[in-house]
């Protein structure tokens, strides 16, 4: 009898100890200052914004200002590239595509116009060497009076756009590479780009409010619209090693490949002002590395106010989501938000 009582007491003690540990762990996450900072930044964020923080399988902080919620759909501009790069890597995972494949393997017209050496990797890292408009000017590039399909647009890129440098050598942040890779995927799979994105990325990730603007020609570099909740599902998948709700979307190897720097500062010729000094990986920018040079923090800011960030060392993701350009222009404010989050999520990150 005494032994049973002792055993029961020990079990209860373990349970209580676990619950106390759990409560203490959660009590350490006090985001009061973060919420106050968001409120104080209302004007700087254009009056409307959402901030979400995700860690350990759940959203641990959520706050909205103005008439804007985590479900509100808004343009995400260049944050679209992260989605497109992930879609590309899903085909690499299956062995249907290699990052070292030449674009001309799928689009022979590129060889005809001396662009046959451009690779898939060059396309998703802005290293094609082809002249092109900036991300924000895609609408002019896809003028419906001029192009009626992605096929026509990409053929025009191959035949009329000038090669300014050899592929793989100079970084120019524009729409060209992502436009080309979207057409490569269409040829490879005999499906429309948006259909493939839905089948492999947005639908499995329950991104129900994520789609593309109905331009005559789809914009795989900056034409998506999404919501804070939706995009956080995407970030959580990457943070969790490619798995979402128990289903594998990407391999861990694919995610690691996407995080590797593809540029050095000496290679960068054209880049957004807010990202000067940053190196590009694939679909994302490198915002932090460890003492060995391994990428630890990545982000993919969009012109229209989306700031998605993953800190792999501290194992959290956060997003600032707005319907306007104010947030995208304020990198110092975004850095201050991250600093306040880091203060609560302590880790030995160097």
Regions found by a protein language model. Give the residues of each.
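Bacterial Sec-dependent N-terminal signal peptides
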Residues: 1-29
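Catalytic loop of the DD-peptidase/beta-lactamase superfamily, centered on the K-T-G motif
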Residues: 28-63, 186-191, 195, 199, ...
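Active-site-proximal loop and beta-strand segments within enzyme catalytic domains
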Residues: 39, 43-47, 67-173, 191
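Catalytic-site signature segments of enzymes, centered on catalytic residues
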Residues: 137-229
